[in-house]
Amino acid sequence: TEIQSFNFNGFVPEN
């Protein structure tokens, strides 16, 4: 999706 979740490592695609 075009939505991205913020991860402790940075922004990661919600694939």
Swiss-Prot record:
Molecular function as annotated in GO: carbohydrate binding
Modification comment: Glycosylated; contains 5-6% carbohydrate.
Keywords of this entry = Glycoprotein, Lectin
Question: How is the quaternary structure described?
Answer: Dimer. The subunits show apparent MW heterogeneity (32000-35000 MW), which may result from different carbohydrate content, AA sequence, or polypeptide length.
Name of the protein in its database record? Acidic lectin A1
Species source reads Psophocarpus scandens
Q: What is the lineage of its organism?
A: Eukaryota, Viridiplantae, Streptophyta, Embryophyta, Tracheophyta
